UniProtKB/Swiss-Prot annotation:
Domain of life assignment: Viruses
Protein name, per record: Envelope glycoprotein B
Region (Involved in fusion and/or binding to host membrane) location: 134-140, 216-223
TM segment ranges: 751-771
Post-translational modification summary for this protein: A proteolytic cleavage by host furin generates two subunits that remain linked by disulfide bonds.
Signal peptide: 1-31
Lineage of the species this protein comes from: Viruses, Duplodnaviria, Heunggongvirae, Peploviricota, Herviviricetes
Length: 883
């Protein structure tokens, strides 16, 4: 703080001195417009042309170049006080880099997880039963009901189908614990040929026996049955762990495609009972399309509720594999690090990391295909590319890479390295020359055998690998030593350059520290360390240059660098303005230093010389002074630049475009599921097109949800009693709904409506007849009950003989009529008595039977009177007998 105040006092004194000198001793060489002090310098307004003898302020205003190449920033640096010091580092100890990365070239095959399903062919056997009810009334028939179902075909009939290509028109099936039979067209059983169906896809082919699904008659109802025997060739899919498989029909079968009864290991998954599954050895299948019989194979048959399915028996280890080959890499490099291997695949722009211990592939389930596939791929690459230049080193090694990739790696070694190691081994063993050649030739013959797939180390594979690895290690150590020597030499060069820096700080500490710090600083030596102070950036509008470099008052002395007056910036970042808000108005005398640096004070002077010509850098351009007087401003582009840099001829990294790598293609992802959606939809569409008379059945809501909600309300509100009440409500509601549904279904039938109409007409007729009978009974009961007993009204009376007989004869005639009437009445009463007696006997028999049953349950003895009760005759019968 004290040094800073001292600087301020000196600046005020210099300001007063300059004002006095300018007023009294102004040089005559200055122009009238400048008045001894140039205006504000703005290099951006300078021009590149030579304008001759003009004032400094006019030259500054001529413009700046369009593309500056020099930094247009000016800094004012004060003398360091020692508050901030720095020291140069001491020489370092140069470490020898003896170790290097171990790399091995070879061939790699990368495996990935196999997500594709296992696809195999199956044959579906079933009979399609359609029961159709039609109604016709001298018009087009209408379908009133239709029932469709599928039933499986038994094994014995399947054998006949595969042998002769014919199927029976009879279907026997079991439903609801009962056996049923259905016949095609309701006719006797017969053999029908299986013909190809016109509707088929790429994944399914069907053969059937009939196309008819309905038959009708001209009048009335008819229920007919059609039995279509169907055989379909389909593709089935199963995914790991292969516990079930699905077909293009949309059906799934809950059994493993590799299921077998005869196995010593654990049995595969199955939810079916053993009697449903059959294994037939040496079974021959007929191709219904070509008629050819296939070679005999082991065949599996499974009977489901709706179909019978057959497929060839397969070995699981030979048919499926949990890994699949992804890519083959002819040029792979294995880089060894401390705890891992890095497999670099340059062509694929990928690197896989793995542990150093080889992976035991026998640990994987269903991965027996990997060694075979890897060996075939590596043998092919080696035969095409490396058979004449390299030999194999050891067997194929497997490593489990990051991300779930299995890497099969085959190490390679060039013939030159092998021969070089053999010669080195011969010299170390001190063998005779002739013997060396014979043994070397024998080793090469025994270790390197030529075959159709190329050279291969067989007899001494492990020893040869050890020797070749040793030779490779020797070469690798030599390369690593060379790189280590380069690094050590670079370190020593830096230590020697450090000594040069120590000497340069004694000559020009400012330039040295500015170069090291990367920004303008002021520095001076304080013994063995350097005091450093930060330079403050001065805005170019706060700088005013003088045209003359001559010292006022002494014509023989001149300034070695241009003189100027500047002011510190008033911005908050300025250290000068932070101490006093009035210091930014203070004009400070200084000189233009090197590299756009402003030196405080005017201490750089020299005796004036003749033919003086100097260029000084200010901002982006140079100021030209001749005879210590400003002439013009020169653009930096007008001065030829001499570069001190030596270009390093190094090849930069080439552009490398990273491309997306698809581990699984879209086709593979589409085939991951057990069922293929496209195939299922296509099959369902084909299936619906076979039967064009099936309409959508719409069933209305019967109100079950409302009654169920009422029952739940009772159960939640009243507890157990509510549950019981809810059960009663649901039962009653179900009964009512069933009754109403039955009545509605009955009324919706045309036959029911016709029957009801006939019944109504008959009832009306019977009612009219009954009404007439009752009215006749009320008006003339004797005539109704005893027809003929009384002559009907309007009958002429019998002619009387009283006109021609005496009175006695007339009385005899009337008595005879009464006797006849009484006889008829007695006969009617006798008939009534017989009917009544007969009814009593029937009633007595029923009463006796009921009493016997009660006595039987009560163990009460029966009596003869109870068994045969006496009949009581009416009184009028006894009187008639007495008469």
């Amino acid at each position: 703080m004290q040094s800073y105040i001292a600087v301020n006092i000196d600046m005020a004194s210099l300001k007063m001195l300059i004002c006095v000198c300018v007023a009294i001793l102004i040089p005559s060489t200055l122009s009238q417009d400048s008045h001894g002090i140039a205006g504000i310098i703005d290099p951006r307004d300078t021009a590149s042309m030579d304008v001759g003898k003009i004032s400094f302020s006019e030259a500054i205003g001529s413009g700046a170049p369009k593309e500056p190449q020099i930094r247009n920033r000016i800094f004012a640096c004060s003398s360091p006080t020692g508050a901030s010091v720095a020291r140069l580092a001491q020489p370092r100890h140069c470490h020898r880099h003896a170790d290097s990365t171990n790399m091995t070239e070879g061939i790699a095959v990368v495996f990935k997880q196999n997500i594709a399903p296992y696809v195999f062919n199956v044959t579906l056997y079933y009979k399609h039963i359609t029961t159709v009810t039609t109604w016709a009334l001298f018009s087009r028939p209408q379908i009133t009901n239709e029932y469709v179902t599928r039933v499986p075909i038994d094994y014995h009939e399947i054998v006949r189908i595969d042998r002769s290509g014919e199927c029976s028109s009879k279907a026997t099936y079991h439903k609801n614990f009962m056996f049923f039979e259905a016949y095609d067209n309701d006719e006797a059983e017969k053999k029908l040929p299986l013909v190809p169906s016109l509707l088929r896809s790429t994944v399914s082919k069907a053969f059937h026996t009939t196309n008819f699904t309905k038959r009708h008659q001209t009048l009335g109802y008819r229920t007919s049955t059609s039995v279509d025997c169907v055989v379909e060739y389909l593709q089935a899919r199963s995914v790991y762990p292969y516990d079930y498989f699905g077909m293009a029909t949309g059906d799934t079968v809950e059994i493993s495609p590799f299921y077998t009864k005869n196995t010593t290991g654990p049995r595969r998954h199955s939810v079916y009972r053993d009697y449903r599954f059959l294994e037939i050895a040496n079974y021959q299948v007929r191709d219904l399309e070509t008629g050819q019989i296939r070679p005999p194979k082991k065949r599996n048959f499974l009977t489901d509720e709706q179909f019978t399915i057959g497929w060839d028996a397969m070995e699981e280890k030979e048919s499926v594999c949990t890994l699949s080959k992804w890519i083959e890499v002819p040029e792979a490099v294995r880089v060894s690090y401390k705890n891992s291997y890095h497999f670099s695949l340059k062509d694929m722009t990928m690197t896989f990391s793995s542990g150093k211990q080889p992976f035991n592939i026998s640990r994987l389930h269903l991965a027996e295909c990997v060694p075979t596939i890897a060996s075939e791929a590596i043998d092919g690459i080696f035969a095409r590319k490396y058979s004449s230049t390299h030999v194999r080193s050891g067997d194929i090694e497997y490593y489990l890479g990051s991300g779930g990739f299995l890497i099969a790696f085959q190490k390679l070694m060039s013939h030159g390295l092998a021969e070089m190691y053999l010669e080195e081994a011969q010299r170390q063993n001190h063998l005779p020359r002739g013997r060396e050649r014979r043994q070397a030739a024998g080793r090469r013959t025994a270790s390197l055998q030529s075959g159709p797939q190329g050279d291969r180390i067989t007899t001494h594979s492990s020893a040869t690998f050890a020797m070749l690895q040793f030779a490779y290690d020797k070469i690798q150590a030599h390369v690593n030593e060379l790189i280590g020597n380069l690094l050590e030499a670079w370190c020593e060069l830096q230590n020697r350059q450090l000594i040069v820096w120590h000497e340069m700080k004694k000559l020009n500490p400012n330039s040295l520290m500015t170069s090291l710090f990367g920004q303008p600083v002021s520095a001076r030596l304080l013994g063995d360390i350097v005091a450093v102070s930060k330079c403050i950036e001065i805005p170019i509008e706060n700088i005013r240059m003088q045209d003359s470099m001559r010292m006022p008052g002494d014509p023989t002395m001149c300034y070695t660098r241009p003189v100027l007056i500047f002011r510190y910036s008033s911005s908050p970042e300025s250290q000068f303005s932070a101490n006093s808000t009035e210091n930014h108005n203070l004009d400070i005398l200084g000189q233009l230093g090197e590299h756009n640096e402003i030196l405080q004070g005017r201490n750089l002077i020299e005796p004036c010389m003749i033919n003086h010509r100097r260029y000084f850098l200010l901002g982006e351009n140079y100021l030209l002074y001749e005879d210590y007087t400003f002439v013009r401003q020169v653009n930096a582009s007008e001065i030829e630049e001499v570069s001190i840099f030596i270009n390093l001829n190094a090849t930069i990294l080439e552009d490398l475009d990273f491309v997306p790598v698809e581990v699984y293609t879209r086709e593979e992802l589409r085939d991951t599921g057990t069922l293929n959606y496209d195939d299922v939809v296509r099959y369902q569409n084909i299936y619906n097109k076979r039967f064009r008379d099936i309409d959508t059945v719409i069933r209305g809501d019967r109100g079950d949800a409302i009654f169920r909600a009422i029952a739940d309300f009772f159960g939640n509100t009243l507890g157990e009693v509510g549950k019981a009440l809810g059960t009663v409500v649901m039962t009653a509601a179900a009964a009512v709904i069933s009754t109403v549904s039955g009545i509605a279904s009955f009324l919706s039938n045309p036959f029911a409506a016709l029957g009801i109409g006939i019944a109504v007409v008959v009832s009306i007729i019977l009612g009219l007849l009954a009404f007439k009978y009752v009215m006749n009974l009320k008006s003339n009961p004797v005539q109704v009950l005893f027809p003929g007993a009384v002559p009907p009204a309007g009958t002429p009376p019998r002619p009387s003989r009283r006109y021609y007989k005496d009175e006695e004869e007339v009385e005899e005639d009337s008595d005879e009529d009464d006797r006849i009437l009484a006889t008829r009445v007695l006969k009617g009463l006798e008939l009534l008595h017989k009917d009544e007696q007969k009814a009593r006997r029937q009633k007595a028999r029923f009463s006796a039977f009921a009493k016997n049953m009660r006595n039987l349950f009560r163990r009460k003895p029966r009596t003869k009177e109870d068994d045969y009760p006496l009949l009581e005759y009416p009184s009028w019968a006894e009187e008639s007998e007495d008469e």
